[in-house]
Amino acid sequence: MRLCLIPWNTGTPQRVLPPVVWSPPSRKKPVLSARNSRMFGYLSPVRIPRLRGKFNLQLPSLDEQVIPARLPKMEVRAEEPKEATEVKDQVQTQEQEDNKRGPCSNGEAASTSRPLETQGNLTSSWYNPRPLEGNVHLKSLTENNQTDKAQVHAVSFYSKGHGVASSHSPAGGILPFGKPDPLPTVLPAPVPGCSLWPEKAALKVLGKDHLPSSPGLLTVGEDMQPKDPAALGSSRSSPPRAAGHRSRKRKLSGPPLQLQPTPPLQLRWERDERPPPAKLPCLSPEALLVGQASQREGRLQQGNMRKNMRVLSRTSKFRRLRQLLRRRKKRQQVRSISACT
């Protein structure tokens, strides 16, 4: 180890040596730098390997024309509801039929509105807005599509005919269009063989709330009910499904069944106490004797079965012992015979 002298006191006078302190030298770590890097090793040049593979670069030719892609145009169409389309189709078909038939005269318009009226004072405003002779006018019912359809069917049915039957008509009970009935207070009874569905449709269209409170209409409602046997037969010829549905509706329309609440259990003992023991059914002495006899027979049968099983097991054991004894005797006889020879 190398020792270095370090002055202790620099402020001493001349001709006096300072005290000497011996201490080990400090170990400094070498620092790598550009100057002293050659001291630690030789520098070797970095070699880059050559490219051995070949690369073919494919560049696009200038002759080729670039065609930009066109985006397809999306057409969005709002679909109309089915109900609106059906209503439009029906309106168009009705207009075509009306155009084919031609314009109706005032008399025809009055005749088409005639099945809904009972006297000369009633007219319908939905088909003929101009009032005729009278004071009562029925309002148009265009709120629901069903009522409109029923009205159109009723009008088309009466427009196909040529007249309205009445009891006071001059020729054959038929009046020409445009002429009012002289005494239209009460309609005659229905002719046998004729269906009453247009009158029923008119009543359904008008409803109970829209019918005016007049005695004439009440008489019409009473006369419209079929009373003749022929009319009853025609009404019975309708499909039975409607009657079945009506009967079901009538049954369901009644008040709902109310279940009676079950009464609470009435305990004969208090909550803290236990219930009394169950009582056994009283049997007659004869029944008791019969039951005891059947029990004895069952026990005897079980005992006999056990005895039989024991006997069988014993017999099988005895048979096995006998077979063993016989085999031993045979072996002894064979040995004695072989010894004698």
Curated annotation (Swiss-Prot):
Pfam families: POM121 (PF15229). Residues 243-252 have a biased composition (Basic residues). Residues 78-131, 216-282 are annotated as: Disordered. Residues 108-127 have a biased composition (Polar residues). Residues 78-89 have a biased composition (Basic and acidic residues). InterPro entries: POM121-like_prot_1 (IPR043220). It comes from the Eukaryota. Belongs to the UPF0607 family. This is Putative UPF0607 protein ENSP00000381514. It comes from Homo sapiens (Human). The lineage of its organism: Eukaryota, Metazoa, Chordata, Craniata, Vertebrata.
